[in-house]
Amino acid sequence: MNKIYRSLILTVSIISITVANPKKGNWKQFDYTSGISSNYIFDVEKDSQSRVWVSTQNGITLIDGNKIKKYGLSHGLPPTNIIKVVSIDNVIYAATSNKGIYYLDDNDMFQKADFIQGDKVYTMNAVGSKLFISTKLENVLYDGQKISFMGNGFPNTKIRDVFIDRDKTVFVGDQEIIVKKGNKYVSEKIKFDKKKVKIKNFFSFKGVDYFGTNKGLWSRTKNESLALISKADVLSLDHDK
């Protein structure tokens, strides 16, 4: 299949994680009974060493070949949902739903980061060599040393997702997408024909834009209006490259 859409209906998280060897086609499922911190999974990240980091409602799990390690309260993580995990420049960052950002130090312990304002985090993504973070108070980039603000035209809004394809970066708000044109950011309001639709994720492929929302999966081409593909509550939208 060229495209894989991962979506769940009327739920808030993934139930388990399944991994495979693409050449052999062998799938293996990991859940709580096999060592994952929780069956409620929010994000999965593969680092530069091909290790898999799984963020859950009850900490983070590291899958390193046949070895599994759980990170939780005893490793410095707070008792709350870990909504995103990102590996950048060999540092693991963990975003929580309401306790800010944490990073894994050289002693294999998570420490709370002091480089952002606001404990409520909406999303955290790698954008080039920098870490993009959207909180209740700000949208910023972190380069490992210092914070920079997004700059001219970037709205003060909640960012739910970031889509990156080559030199194109799309920041996704509840009802808008934001792109950089020239030296400034431009927002586009997305108009759905249903009420109370909130965008959760975005993907663009071969001239078609896909919007994963709380009211279904929508698509559009350049000269056409939005079309509803599925009524599912889409939590993740991805592509099998």
Model-found features: residue ranges?
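Carboxylate-rich, polar loop motifs that coordinate divalent cations or form catalytic acidic clusters
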Residues: 1-241
